[in-house]
Amino acid sequence: MLTNASQVLLRNSDLVKDQSVLVLNYESDHLPKELLATASSVCGLALDYHHHLMMQPYAAANLTLHFGHQLPTDECFDTVIVYFPKAKALAPYLFNLAAKHLKPQGQLIVAGENKGGIKSLPKQLPSYFDKAFKVDNARHCILFTSELNSPAPELKLKDWLSRYQLDTPQGQVTICNLVGVFSEKKLDEGTQLLLANLPKMSGNVLDFGCGAGVITAALLKAQPDLKLECVDINAMALASCELTLEANGFTAKVFASDGLAQTSQRYDGIISNPPFHDGLASTTNIATNFVKDSANNLKAGGLFHIVANRHLPYSDTIAEHFGSVNVLAENNKYKIYSNVK
């Protein structure tokens, strides 16, 4: 099943007839493969690891697939398709990345949902692109095209980075935040409660949904001998976490994982401010699987320590997989669940 934006792209696939195409920030479907019916070759760069895993089985000589915040080569394409990102701050980065990989006068195609901010695209396109032209408006989405009219500035990661000092209960740490990664430049309420009620951890610890590495940095500030692994599904988050570790002189293993599927060991501790907050049925299922997988990936005596919105139904699942529920602390918004396996 194609997303709405992908359906609009596919019905305009004559725009890429016999062309080499790069698809940036593709969604949870098989659109890159579908484009091969008209395009001569397709390369996809996913910023979401789950999206990458969905497409990976279809990789072929004319369909190359990558996960990350940049491509591993400087290859240039006839057309670059950009899915307008849900995090609007990421859009200028993607346009710069698109320009880097476009041939002179190459075609830019941008598709996105009306409610996601795509309507303002003509004002957002940088000057090295021509004025955006609206080609289609369907499925609550808009499709724009443009053309590269001059070379773009060199893409330097430091130009897209926010770096700031953060006070935590464990001490002050430096946080490096790339565009599109959640940040308030201060401790969000949930993480504040989590770190204010941090038990002493030991051995191998997993920071699930690490984001820019706030929890990891605080942990290592207090306990530099911990062996930490940091996982996230988002390429910009993983790059941010690596930069945060470097800025503080800390060491941890950072890698992409869809849930806990790509982890390969059992842990002495799992800590998280999990990125499931909206209470939708799909979110609840993901949260349930996270608790179950955490129990399966903890050693006997291992600690499961998370913060969650108090309205999310964690208690029953934790009781099922850990035998009991221990709420270590709570306020009017959040609960700290801290359970030993």
UniProtKB/Swiss-Prot annotation:
| Entry keywords, A to Z | Cytoplasm, Methyltransferase, rRNA processing, S-adenosyl-L-methionine, Transferase
Its domain of life reads Bacteria
Gene Ontology, cellular component aspect? cytoplasm
Show the InterPro entries listed in the entry. Answer: DNA_methylase_N6_adenine_CS, Mtase_sm_N, rRNA_ssu_MeTfrase_C, RsmC/RlmG, SAM-dependent_MTases_sf, Small_mtfrase_dom
Record-linked CDD domains = AdoMet_MTases
Keyword Ion transport present in the record's keywords: the answer is no
Q: A GO molecular function for this record? A: nucleic acid binding
Where does the UniProt entry say this protein principally localizes? cytoplasm
Q: What is its EC number?
A: 2.1.1.172
One Pfam family matching this protein:
MTS
The places in or outside the cell where this protein is found are: Cytoplasm
Catalyzed reaction equations: guanosine(1207) in 16S rRNA + S-adenosyl-L-methionine = N(2)-methylguanosine(1207) in 16S rRNA + S-adenosyl-L-homocysteine + H(+)
Note the subunit structure. Answer: Monomer.
Q: Which PANTHER family match?
A: RIBOSOMAL RNA SMALL SUBUNIT METHYLTRANSFERASE C (PTHR47816:SF4)
The function of this protein is: Specifically methylates the guanine in position 1207 of 16S rRNA in the 30S particle.
What family does the Swiss-Prot or TrEMBL record give for this protein? Belongs to the methyltransferase superfamily. RsmC family.
What is the name listed in the Swiss-Prot or TrEMBL entry for this protein?
A: Ribosomal RNA small subunit methyltransferase C
The organism is: Shewanella pealeana (strain ATCC 700345 / ANG-SQ1)
- Organism placement in taxonomy: Bacteria, Pseudomonadati, Pseudomonadota, Gammaproteobacteria, Alteromonadales
